[in-house]
């Protein structure tokens, strides 16, 4: 009583306290960062190593395996995968959430150093690492195009000037430059001309290498001066290499231009990049795992004018893709939803109280509670994201509940003629414990979420803490500011009603009278109600088992990624044509705004595309509907497949794949894996629950297998090293010399001119100079035949691995796909030597599925414990918790009705319902107990009176919560995929629980009271005996 009086009779102090809370919240809001979701990125580090010319199998055994053994010893590594292709190996290390990325990077460098002695000696450089996840979609893509500069020159500007500067910006983890390679002098040899002149490829290589050197020449010095010696020992351009003498034949000089075409070109001609059908260089920027995407993008944009000034005016630098606009639009939508929710909640209060003066009180209490929460969010290191703003939207209905309960009870005393200050004190005292019970039990619901580990726990923590803080501030405001305002603002009489509102008042009275009559009938037919309650419990279990489930709602971020997978024997020229064809099909779609793509590198048969869709208000279809439409058109393109997926704000794992979900096959027997992977992939491709099934197993590439006749080689005076050097010189784009420039280093690349390597007969034109100086054709000592060879070798841990990726067809959920895959694996009878498991997001979904029921049970148990402590009773908490089955049924039925799978967002809705619907029961039980103790009423009379007296606040709080969540259901635009499942769950649960709990709660109350009396009689009889 004294606590309440302290604030009621000291209005200035109470007002200033509320102002202080509001000011702190405003300051916190201004400093809060903006993000699409809470920080849930796993720390990921990518290790790269190269050995030019080495086969994928050689890279896997000699480079990947030693590194994996050393890196696998690092503490906190949750997953390690590797992919080895022609000349390169990439190892992805995913760490536990609590692992510091900088500390992990130091351990990675130490592990690389420890493995250095086990790596091949021919590696051009030590393995390197980057603190970025290559499977993440870029946060921004910049393109460079020009009508005057070549692709190589553009690549040089991008990699030498732009990429290093962008990499230094806070939050940037990696800048990947694609679409071409660095400039180089290319020497394309004519094998027939070489044969005619008696010049070997090694002769050419040695001559070029000896003619382009950069060595110190020293200095001249006398008594007074010093002269640095400088020579023209370096050749810079193709024109300078052209006249180079490489051999003398019969006294005549054989120049390089006589046997080769020398051009200023690029290091690797098997690279191509495009933007909207125009050749381009792409800068794909990825953020650090812990970085804020909006802040990073803003920093890059602020740097762009300065970057533009560092490159020539003839180069066009454009932003081809930016992830931030849809994120900003989504957050704006949530903010608008929050404002609408606040307005609707206040409207509900006004309709019930029918007094503008009384409505001002919750209209003040709600903003104070919500704004004050921003200060706590800032102190906790949170951000303004979809989940935290959704928490505040839902909190609108909660925070007004406390004010409503206090306000309604005070208003009831005023209507009875009590003086305002006395009514404020008496009314607050009566419901103070009720409000405390409602708030503490609601916060208790989220305790299991706060203790939940892994990605789901990290994802939901901000939501739970934000909502809990809002409820805590609301509790303080409802017991201080609200009664003070009631005592000083409200009058001791019934408020005058406007004529337009009298109809609503009469309707409410009629509804209350009808409820009273129906409640009397229910209390006389308790068995029927008990059966209905048991039926709802059984229905809950059946609905939960049968409802489709997924991890996280599929988002429409306005960005698509596409992976091209062509025949494994395709040439680069043909692959570049496929890229152009696919880009044209997509670019012609009316919903597409921009398309960029690239192909080449170590995997010639693959490519990537990044597609920006038009804003949501400029297209009528969702990203998934656009993908479905494009899939039909793309399927008509022969020789290659383009797999599209919508970019998501959450992606788990470091595997780069062509689809959203992964299923990984592991085996210590590589032959068994290669035998069973095609069988499993073909089986999964037939399942209707899966779409876009593809695999990263590339073991069917075309190979020309040469077999040396060693005896013949020995007789002809040729060794294997000379023969291998011949092949590398001719076909390996061999880098034979370095050109040093002030800003960078460039290579001289030698190979047989592509004009002479169009078919297998090119091998017949190759020859080796033996130890007697004679030209020996390759065909004299080698035979060749076509064969198959892997384009890549993949590991997970230290086991051979193959990952099958898939998307979900429209109307199918991840639970459907998971069950279908498990059935297919059982039907195929896969041997124990081949193990299958879900990876990435699908793996987290499996783990979350196993913990969902436990989490719900833990929340219910926590609420029971809190209520038991508050009521000092084992029975009354059960009465209050009896409201939950009806809410669960309503929520699950609503999800089914809207064809929405049960996701992590829907789980949040279920947890919220546990806190919301029990409020009705708390108000009934509190007043019934009070009536029994002080009114000398029977239990049935007490609960009947409590139900009628609390009918208006129950309707007000329920409708406030319902209208607070309704904008989430009805909202469209960016980010609505996240908001709608939460709103659907809450609205569905509230509607069903309101219909049933008004009747089931009093019945359960009477049931447990009779049970209590029965046990007390037995106890008395036992004592008497």
UniProtKB/Swiss-Prot annotation:
One Pfam entry name: ACR_tran
Cellular compartments annotated: Cell inner membrane
Source organism of the structure: Escherichia coli O157:H7
GO molecular function per UniProt: xenobiotic transmembrane transporter activity
Cytoplasmic side: 1-6, 354-359, 412-430, 491-852, 918-947, 1008-1025
Gene3D superfamilies, per database record: Multidrug efflux transporter AcrB pore domain, Multidrug efflux transporter AcrB pore domain like, Multidrug efflux transporter AcrB TolC docking domain, DN and DC subdomains, Multidrug efflux transporter AcrB transmembrane domain
Transmembrane segments: 7-29, 336-353, 360-379, 389-411, 431-453, 468-490, 853-875, 895-917, 948-970, 985-1007
Keyword Zinc-finger belongs to the record: no
GO cellular component assignments: plasma membrane
Family membership: Belongs to the resistance-nodulation-cell division (RND) (TC 2.A.6) family. MdtC subfamily.
Protein's membrane topology: Multi-pass membrane protein
Protein name: Multidrug resistance protein MdtC
Residue ranges annotated as Periplasmic topological domain: 30-335, 380-388, 454-467, 876-894, 971-984
Signal peptide range: none
Record-linked PANTHER family: MULTIDRUG RESISTANCE PROTEIN MDTC (PTHR32063:SF34), PTHR32063
Assembly notes: Part of a tripartite efflux system composed of MdtA, MdtB and MdtC. MdtC forms a heteromultimer with MdtB.
């Amino acid at each position: 009583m004294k606590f309440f009086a302290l604030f009621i009779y000291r209005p200035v102090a109470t007002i200033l306290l509320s102002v202080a809370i509001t000011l702190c919240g405003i300051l916190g809001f201004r400093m809060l960062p903006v993000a699409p979701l809470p920080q849930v990125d796993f720390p990921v580090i990518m290790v790269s190593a190269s050995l030019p010319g080495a086969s994928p199998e050689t890279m896997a055994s000699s480079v990947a395996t030693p590194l994996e053994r050393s890196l696998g010893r690092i503490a906190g590594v949750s997953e390690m995968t590797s992919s080895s292709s022609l000349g390169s190996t990439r190892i992805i290390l995913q760490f536990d959430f609590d692992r510091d990325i900088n500390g992990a990077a130091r351990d990675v460098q130490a592990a690389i150093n420890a493995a250095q002695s086990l790596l091949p000696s021919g590696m051009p450089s030590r393995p390197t690492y980057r603190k970025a996840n290559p499977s993440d979609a870029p946060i921004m893509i910049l393109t460079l195009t020009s009508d005057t500069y070549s692709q190589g020159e553009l690549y040089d500007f991008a990699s030498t000037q732009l990429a290093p500067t962008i990499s230094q910006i806070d939050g940037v983890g990696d800048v990947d430059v694609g679409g071409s390679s660095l400039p180089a002098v290319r020497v394309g040899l004519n094998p027939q001309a070489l044969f005619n002149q008696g010049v070997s490829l090694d002769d050419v290589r040695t001559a070029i290498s000896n003619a382009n050197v950069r060595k110190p020449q020293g200095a001249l010095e006398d008594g007074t001066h010093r002269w640095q010696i400088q020579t023209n020992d370096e050749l810079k351009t193709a024109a300078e290499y052209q006249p180079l003498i490489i051999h003398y034949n019969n006294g005549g000089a054989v120049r390089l231009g006589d046997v080769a075409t020398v051009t200023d070109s690029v290091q690797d001609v098997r690279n191509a990049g495009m933007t909207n059908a125009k050749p381009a260089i792409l800068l794909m920027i990825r953020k650090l795992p812990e970085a804020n995407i909006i802040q990073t993008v803003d920093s890059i944009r602020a740097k762009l004018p300065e970057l533009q000034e560092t490159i020539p005016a003839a180069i066009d630098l454009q932003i081809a893709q930016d992830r931030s606009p849809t994120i900003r639009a989504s957050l704006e939508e949530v903010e608008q939803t929050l404002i609408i929710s606040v307005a609707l909640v206040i409207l509900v209060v006004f309709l019930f109280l029918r007094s503008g003066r009384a409505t001002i009180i919750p209209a003040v209490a709600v903003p104070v509670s919500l704004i004050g929460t921003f200060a706590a969010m800032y102190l906790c290191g949170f951000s303004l994201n979809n989940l935290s703003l959704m928490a505040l939207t839902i909190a609108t209905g909660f925070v007004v509940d406390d004010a409503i309960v206090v306000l309604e009870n005070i208003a009831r005393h005023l209507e009875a003629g009590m003086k305002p200050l006395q009514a404020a004190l008496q009314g607050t005292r009566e419901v103070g414990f009720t409000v405390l019970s409602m708030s503490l039990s609601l916060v208790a619901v989220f305790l299991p979420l706060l203790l939940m580990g892994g990605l789901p726990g990290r994802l939901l923590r901000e939501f739970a803490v934000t909502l809990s803080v809002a409820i805590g501030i609301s509790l303080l405001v409802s017991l201080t500011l609200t009664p003070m305002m009631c005592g000083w603002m409200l009058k001791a009489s019934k408020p005058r009603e406007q004529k337009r509102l009298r109809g609503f008042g009469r309707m409410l009275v009629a509804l209350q009278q009808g409820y009273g009559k129906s409640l009397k009938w229910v209390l006389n037919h308790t068995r029927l109600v008990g059966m209905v309650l048991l039926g709802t419990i059984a229905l809950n279990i059946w609905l939960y088992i049968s409802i489709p489930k997924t991890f996280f709602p599929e988002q429409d971020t306005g960005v698509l990624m596409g992976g091209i997978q062509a025949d494994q024997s395709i040439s680069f020229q043909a692959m570049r044509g496929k890229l152009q064809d696919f880009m044209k099909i997509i670019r012609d779609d009316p919903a597409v705004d921009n398309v960029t793509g690239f192909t080449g590198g170590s995997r010639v048969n693959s490519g990537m595309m990044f597609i920006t869709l038009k804003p949501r208000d400029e297209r009528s279809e969702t990203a998934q509907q656009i993908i479905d439409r494009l899939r039909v058109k793309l399927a008509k393109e022969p020789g290659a497949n383009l797999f599209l997926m919508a970019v998501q704000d959450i992606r788990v794992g470091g595997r780069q794949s062509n689809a959203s979900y992964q299923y990984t096959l592991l085996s210590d027997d590589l032959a068994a894996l290669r035998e069973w992977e095609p069988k499993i992939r073909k089986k999964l491709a037939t399942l209707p629950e899966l779409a876009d099934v593809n695999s990263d197993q590339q073991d069917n590439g075309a190979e020309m297998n040469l077999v040396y006749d060693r005896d013949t080689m020995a007789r002809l005076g040729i060794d294997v090293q000379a023969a291998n050097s011949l092949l590398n010189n001719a076909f390996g784009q061999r880098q034979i010399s370095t050109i040093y420039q002030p800003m960078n280093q460039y290579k001289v690349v030698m190979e047989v001119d592509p004009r002479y390597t169009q078919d297998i007969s090119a091998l017949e034109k190759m020859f080796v100079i033996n130890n007697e100086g004679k030209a020996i054709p390759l065909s004299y000592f080698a035979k060749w035949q076509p064969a198959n060879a892997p384009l890549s070798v993949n590991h997970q841990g230290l086991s051979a691995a193959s990952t099958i990726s898939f998307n979900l067809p429209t109307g199918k959920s991840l639970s459907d796909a998971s069950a279908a895959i498990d059935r297919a694996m059982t039907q195929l009878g896969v041997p124990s030597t081949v193990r299958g498991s879900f990876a990435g997001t699908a793996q987290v979904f499996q783990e979350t599925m196993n913990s969902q029921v436990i989490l719900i049970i833990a929340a219910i148990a926590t609420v029971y414990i809190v209520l038991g402590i508050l009521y000092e009773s084992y029975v009354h908490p059960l009465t209050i918790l009896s409201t939950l089955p009806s809410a669960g049924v309503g929520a699950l039925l609503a999800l089914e009705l809207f064809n929405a799978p049960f996701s992590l967002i829907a789980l949040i809705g279920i947890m919220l319902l546990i806190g919301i619907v029990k409020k009705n029961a708390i108000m009934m039980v509190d007043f019934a107990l009070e009536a029994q103790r002080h009114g000398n009423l029977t239990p049935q009379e007490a609960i009947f009176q409590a139900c009628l007296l609390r009918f208006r606040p129950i309707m007000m709080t329920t409708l406030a919560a319902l209208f607070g969540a309704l904008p989430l259901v009805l909202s469209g635009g960016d980010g609505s995929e996240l908001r709608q499942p939460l709103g659907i769950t809450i609205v569905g649960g509230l509607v069903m629980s309101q219909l049933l709990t008004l009747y089931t709660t009093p019945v359960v109350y009477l049931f447990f009271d009779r049970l209590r009396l029965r046990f007390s009689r037995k106890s008395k009889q036992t004592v008497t005996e």
